[in-house]
């Protein structure tokens, strides 16, 4: 969308470009740290690794970055940008080439959240000659990151293959063997067929395929104020089964045709699929009656009144019956569309008039298929008491269809 610092500086509205040189210099794997240098961006941390960042542009709601447009290579990347915009999936920035941030009027052609802005992640381009590389780092808490790529371009055919592995043992532990870490895998492949660069009518067709997955022993359960003050990295025993599993695939086919007279047309068709199941603690029971169940929010807001629930949550009190209620928040997302952009540079007097017109049809869907399981707890160890019926909790399908278009003009 921008492509350089120069384009960002000369953009209408506010735009910022994090160049490949800057990303390479700091070597971050967390988008939260990358965006700290960008004015007008507010972020609050959640897991400490940037797996699911909460980004706000110009004061918009930060939770799950659901009020900004998240894109990869100019294509909407959130699981369901219109039907369910909460970004439980976020592209792995450790494999990105550059980051572009647009706020307010500078991003009207990207939508759907034109009030806040857009964050576009530019993936690694196909190299013009043979390139291969390997980058590895290791840090505290068994945090490991490795990235490998291989690509080249021969006459009229280019290709690129990338692999990323990102993992950590985590730092929220009650005992040494407790699982609180995560791992991520990400594979991306590109194939490009193109004409000669100096052809009278230059054309290119690029296919991009991607697959990624994640397993993280992450929990929604926090701490009471007293526990946070005394042991901020503590994790309650009632959250030991909490985990998130995800799978994501992406397909994009992009065609470019450029004429010598200054006319260029870029068209992309895309499809993204995302599946997640966040298996997490919802409620705690001290008995079988309706009034003997409390949500985690209620318990931690008033731990003194809910002392019996806290004892079960922390594992200091055994309960052999139905004690801990976990919900499998299983959801699948489908996102697809086609978009085209026409650019024309017209000489006028002693300057140029740059015209840009674009249109996009987009459709997405969220399908919820959830259930609850109940666990007992004894000696600080949880065991399954009763398995729930798949699809027995808060199921629904949400769909959205959208058409957007724009026309921009600029003197230069």
Where do the language-model regions lie?
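Transmembrane beta-barrel wall of Gram-negative outer-membrane proteins
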Residues: 131, 138-167, 175-219, 243-247, ...
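Non-catalytic regulatory/gating segments with a bias toward low-complexity or hydrophobic composition
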Residues: 23, 35, 99-100, 119-121, ...
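Structural signature of outer-membrane beta-barrel domains
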Residues: 6, 77, 124, 139-141, ...
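Extracellular loop and loop/strand-boundary signature of outer-membrane beta-barrel proteins
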Residues: 84, 131-135, 171-179, 183-184, ...
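Short acidic/polar hinge/loop motifs at secondary-structure boundaries
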Residues: 75-103
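Extracytoplasmic beta-strand/coil segments of soluble accessory domains associated
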Residues: 32-79
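Short, acidic, small-residue-rich periplasmic hinge/interaction motif at the N-terminus
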Residues: 1-24
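Face-selective signature of the C-terminal outer-membrane beta-barrel domain
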Residues: 198-206, 246-412
């Amino acid at each position: 969308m921008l492509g350089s610092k120069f384009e960002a500086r000369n953009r209408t509205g506010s735009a910022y470009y994090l160049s490949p040189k800057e990303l390479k210099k700091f070597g971050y794997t967390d988008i939260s740290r990358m965006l700290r240098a960008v004015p007008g961006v507010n972020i609050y941390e959640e897991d400490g690794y940037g797996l699911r960042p909460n980004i706000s542009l110009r004061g918009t709601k930060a939770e799950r970055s659901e009020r900004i447009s998240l894109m990869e290579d100019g294509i909407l990347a959130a699981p369901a940008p219109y039907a369910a915009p909460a970004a439980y999936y976020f592209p792995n920035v450790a494999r990105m080439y550059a980051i572009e941030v647009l706020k307010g009027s500078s991003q009207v052609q990207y939508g759907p959240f034109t009030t806040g802005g857009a964050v576009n992640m530019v993936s690694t381009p196909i190299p013009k000659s043979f390139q291969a590389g390997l980058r590895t780092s290791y840090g505290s808490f068994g945090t490991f990151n490795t990235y490998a790529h291989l690509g080249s371009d021969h006459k009229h055919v280019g290709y690129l293959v990338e692999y990323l592995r990102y993992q950590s043992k985590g730092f929220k532990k009650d005992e040494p063997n407790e699982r609180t870490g995560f791992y991520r895998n990400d594979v991306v492949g590109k194939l490009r067929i193109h004409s000669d660069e100096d052809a009278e009518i230059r054309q290119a067709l690029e296919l991009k395929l991607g697959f990624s997955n994640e397993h993280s022993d992450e929990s929604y359960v926090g701490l009471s104020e007293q526990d946070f003050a005394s042991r901020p990295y503590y994790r309650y025993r009632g959250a030991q089964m909490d985990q998130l599993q995800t799978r994501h695939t992406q397909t994009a086919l992009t065609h470019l045709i450029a004429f010598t007279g200054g006319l260029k047309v870029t068209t992309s068709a895309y499809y993204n699929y995302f599946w997640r199941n966040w298996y997490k603690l919802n409620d705690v029971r001290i008995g079988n009656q309706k009034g003997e169940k409390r949500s985690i929010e209620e318990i931690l807001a008033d731990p003194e009144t809910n002392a019996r629930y806290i004892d079960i949550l922390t594992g200091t009190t055994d309960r052999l019956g139905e004690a801990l209620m976990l919900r499998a928040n299983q959801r699948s997302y489908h996102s697809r569309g086609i978009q085209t952009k026409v650019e024309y540079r017209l000489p006028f007097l002693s300057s140029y008039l740059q015209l840009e017109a674009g249109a996009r049809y987009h459709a997405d869907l969220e399908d919820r298929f959830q259930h609850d399981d109940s666990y007992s707890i004894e000696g600080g160890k949880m065991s399954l008491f009763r398995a729930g019926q798949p699809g027995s909790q808060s199921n629904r399908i949400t769909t959205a269809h959208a058409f957007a278009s724009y026309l921009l003009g600029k003197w230069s």
